[in-house]
Amino acid sequence: DLAKFGQFILNKGSWNNKQLLAPEYIEKLLTVYINTDDKVFPDSKLGYGYYFWKCQPEKAFRCAGLFGQYCIILPKENMVIAITSNAENEQKQAILSATWKFLAQIKKDNKSSTQDLSSLNNYLSKLHLPYLPNDNSIIPEIFQQEFKFSHNPLNLNSISFSQISPDCIRINITLNTRKYNLLAKLNTWKNNNTNSENDNFDSCTTIFYENPYANYGWQNNKLNLKLVYNQGIFIDTLEFNYYNHQLYLHYNPTSSFIIRTKPHYFISNPIK
């Protein structure tokens, strides 16, 4: 979606051969109106237009979201760059600087070929986020029972686990507003289609977004679960420990925002 929006701006308001926005409005969007030379980072000092920041490359602008989400429009290069990242404020300039360095290199080489594209696709196919470590210190007590929680900031009512196969578990999560069922695998990112609805969705405060990639691992008699939402910026890490008939949950979110500003610790009600 970010790339499509950028292409729409690059096309001066045209999409699928239809002029949806007058070109003069696009020109106004990409014009600096506010002086920002008091900012710290190089790409924040060049000025601000209507929702767009001026960038270091000639005639380049970007719209910027929280945590390193960028849609960069480069009219001179006839190029759009869409970036979704999990970055805090101090990391944002590093992302842009790396982008300009890469852009300068490909302009210097001034070539591309089918072989280059094949090599790039092969390289990209091997990239993945690191898997959680696993020492097989399984906690059998957490399976086949439901752990219930009292009132908490996550609105978490209950959670249960079941072993589907030696390398796959199912996690059933009940919140105040919905049920959330997913699969997680060892040494693999398991894609989930949760098909759950949340009428009270709020990108600032909603916990557990749709369709995460899930990976888990056992370590030091704890179950670790990581949920990656690759259509956005957030990653949730959950650590489960079982002690004295209770489930101890450590919820650690990134990036830090609203309810995600700090880790949360929960203890389930005792299993009778």
Walk through the language-model features, giving the residues of each:
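Peripheral terminal and inter-domain segments
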Residues: D116-K272
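Short loop/turn hinge sites at secondary-structure boundaries
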Residues: K12-N17, D109, N187-W189
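Glycine-centered flexibility sites
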Residues: G6, G13, N17, G49, ...
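Active-site-proximal alpha-helical segments within enzyme catalytic domains
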Residues: D1-S14, Q69-N86
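Low-complexity, Gly/Ser/Thr/Pro-rich intrinsically disordered linker/tail segments
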Residues: Y51, C55-P57, A64, L74-P75, ...
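Short Gly/Pro-enriched loop/turn and capping motifs at secondary-structure junctions
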Residues: P57-K59, Q69, A87-E88, N230-F234, ...
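Active-site Gly/Thr loop motif
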Residues: E27-I83
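A conserved catalytic-loop motif detector
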Residues: D1-L10, S14-K39
